Amino acid sequence: MNINRSRLINNFIFISILVFFDQWSKYLVVKYIRIGTEYLSFFGDFFKIIHVRNTGVLFSIGSNIDPSLKNLFFLIIPIIILIFVFSFALKETNRIARIALVLILSGGIGNIIDRFFRPLGVVDFLDVKFFGIFGLQRWPTFNFADSYVVIGITLFIIYDLFAKNQSTNL
């Protein structure tokens, strides 16, 4: 098996596992926790599991825009971006960059699945205290797909700033 085919298979397996975990966690939240209900709290109120829906994007931005525009901004454009990221990931030779891109793809796919199949919005359920940093007492509620995207982007920025000029096979 050539390296590109092996890389494609590995990426597909990794993406499938992450998307499955994201969707499974959302399924459990939808099945067992009513919308707007806090289910568990850990370490006082530092970390909570609460079922909310997000009809916008990051931090609920755009949740009030016209529904006819939501398909364009929250489905079509993200799908085009994911196709670009996927093609970039297939060509990338650096392992760190590939992992970052696969994380971004996994998160994007997980949230796009919600947009297609959950008319009430993307399922968010992880709620973390933020101690007033940036004026936020609590970080906006998120899900595993959101985490994949943030970790992937952070990892890619670190790679781009520090490791890009190093060997391509870190």
UniProtKB/Swiss-Prot annotation:
GO MF entry, a single one: aspartic-type endopeptidase activity
The GO cellular component terms are: plasma membrane
Its EC number is 3.4.23.36
List where the protein spans the membrane. 13-33, 72-92, 96-113, 142-162
The entry's active site is D124, D146
Keyword Secreted attached = no
Where is this protein localized, as stated in its record? Cell inner membrane
Catalytic activity field: Release of signal peptides from bacterial membrane prolipoproteins. Hydrolyzes -Xaa-Yaa-Zaa-|-(S,diacylglyceryl)Cys-, in which Xaa is hydrophobic (preferably Leu), and Yaa (Ala or Ser) and Zaa (Gly or Ala) have small, neutral side chains
Keywords for the protein's UniProt record, in alphabetical order: Aspartyl protease, Cell inner membrane, Cell membrane, Hydrolase, Membrane, Protease, Transmembrane, Transmembrane helix
**Biological pathway:** Protein modification; lipoprotein biosynthesis (signal peptide cleavage)
Q: Which GO terms describe its biological process?
A: proteolysis
Identify the Pfam families for this entry: Peptidase_A8
* InterPro entries according to UniProt: Peptidase_A8
The membrane topology term of the UniProt record is: Multi-pass membrane protein
Lineage top rank: taxon: Bacteria
Database matches in NCBIfam families? lspA
As for what it does, the entry says: This protein specifically catalyzes the removal of signal peptides from prolipoproteins.
The entry sums up its family as follows: Belongs to the peptidase A8 family.
State the name under which the record lists this protein: Lipoprotein signal peptidase
Species classification:
Bacteria, Pseudomonadati, Spirochaetota, Spirochaetia, Spirochaetales
